[in-house]
């Protein structure tokens, strides 16, 4: 009996390694050291010594990990695997920049039922695309074939991001104060949270198939809308951070993921402060309205589960809010004043 008889194909793994090599190497810069396929990836922190010393006197490394959750089940239903890798990168790097740091490199883990090199290459293409968007290197990864654990065409994935921030420029929300402005950056739909509820409502209770096109979605299918990739905010947010280096301009940063605005915005504010959110300051995207109507799901539950169209929030000094928003718009972001910081909390206030 062989390992292949037991369901693990080492040759398929070797073919996958060859297929994904160009996808991995397109994310590399001269800061990546060592040959492709080594036991561990190496990344040079001080590649440009002069530039490094100019920006980092006390560099602090940042690490985070996250996954995509049951959004993968929508990908299985549509048999489309080239975007969930973008989600995987986004969920990590959008978290990482919340302390003011920049992503350096990314690692991934895939657990699969049957290793199909072509299908795995689609997943890695998405991860590679996400790394390019986030300007970080795909430094390495692991793919484990476990036929006793997963169904043949199913898999799970996890990502790990490492970044760096100058110690004196760490953003932790401690200098936020009443009167500061909360700037919202628009999401591109559901992103990667709330899929347990979204699938239950749309695919089970409402009975939609992934190919169905409800009129509420303006021509998009249910599957297309649910599989829309998570927006990566790295380049835009870092551009603002580099332009406004004075610490008391950008006070706090929040990635709006599971728990929505109520579960994420208070996390970055000190005790005694909250944000008064203007509910009418943005138009809630159609996908959220459809979920709410078909559930039905009440407003409070929607706000506590989904991003509701707000993917990221910056808390900034009031005198700088308008120029920061102008800069973000030139970078391609849709943004608006979400509300203002005031005394109170820990819950958000709604206007």
PLM feature spans:
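Hydrophobic face of alpha-helices
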Residues: 17, 121-124, 195
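Residue-level signature of catalytic and energy-coupling elements of molecular machines
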Residues: 9, 66, 179, 255, ...
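Glycine-/charge-enriched secondary-structure boundary and capping motifs
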Residues: 2-6, 119-134, 150-155, 209, ...
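Short, acidic Gly/Pro/Ser/Thr-rich loop/turn segments
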Residues: 13, 49-50, 68-71, 166-169, ...
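Glycine-rich beta-alpha junction loops
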Residues: 40, 163-165, 182, 187-191, ...
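Short, acidic (Asp/Glu-rich) active-site segment that either coordinates a divalent metal cofactor
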Residues: 65, 156, 169-223, 262
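N-terminal amphipathic/basic leader segments beginning at the initiator methionine
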Residues: 1-33
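Glycine-rich phosphate/pyrophosphate-binding loop regions near the starts of catalytic domains
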Residues: 22-188
């Amino acid at each position: 009996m062989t390992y292949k008889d037991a369901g693990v194909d080492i040759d398929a793994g070797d073919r996958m390694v060859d297929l994904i090599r160009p996808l991995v190497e397109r994310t590399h810069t001269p800061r990546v050291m060592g040959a492709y396929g080594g036991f561990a990836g190496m990344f040079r922190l001080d590649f440009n010594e002069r530039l490094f010393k100019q920006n980092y006197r006390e560099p602090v490394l940042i690490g985070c990990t996250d996954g995509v959750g049951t959004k993968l089940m929508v990908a299985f239903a549509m048999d489309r695997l080239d975007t969930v890798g973008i989600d995987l990168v986004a969920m990590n790097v959008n978290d990482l920049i919340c302390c003011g740091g920049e992503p350096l490199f990314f690692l991934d883990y895939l657990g699969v039922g049957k290793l199909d090199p072509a299908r795995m290459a689609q997943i890695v293409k998405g991860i590679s695309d996400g790394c390019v968007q986030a300007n970080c290197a795909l430094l390495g990864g692991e793919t484990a074939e476990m036929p006793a654990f997963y169904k043949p065409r199913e898999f799970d994935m996890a990502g790990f991001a490492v970044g760096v921030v100058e110690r004196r420029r760490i953003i932790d929300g401690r200098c936020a104060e009443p009167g500061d402005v909360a700037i919202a950056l628009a999401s591109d739909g559901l992103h990667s949270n709330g899929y347990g509820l979204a699938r239950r409502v749309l695919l089970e209770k409402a009975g939609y198939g992934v190919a169905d096109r409800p009129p509420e979605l303006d021509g998009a299918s249910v599957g297309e809308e649910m599989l829309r990739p998570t927006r990566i905010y790295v380049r835009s947010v870092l551009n603002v951070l580099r332009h406004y280096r004075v610490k008391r301009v950008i006070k706090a940063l929040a990635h709006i993921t599971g728990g929505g605005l109520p579960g994420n915005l208070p996390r970055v504010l000190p005790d005694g402060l909250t944000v008064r959110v203007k509910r009418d300051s943005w138009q809630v995207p159609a996908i959220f309205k459809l979920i709410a109507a078909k559930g039905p799901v009440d407003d409070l539950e929607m706000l506590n589960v989904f991003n509701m169209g707000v993917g990221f929030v910056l808390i900034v000094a009031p005198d700088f809010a308008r120029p920061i928003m102008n800069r973000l718009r030139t970078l391609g972001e849709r943004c608006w004043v979400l509300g203002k910081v005031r005394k109170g909390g820990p819950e958000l206030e709604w206007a």
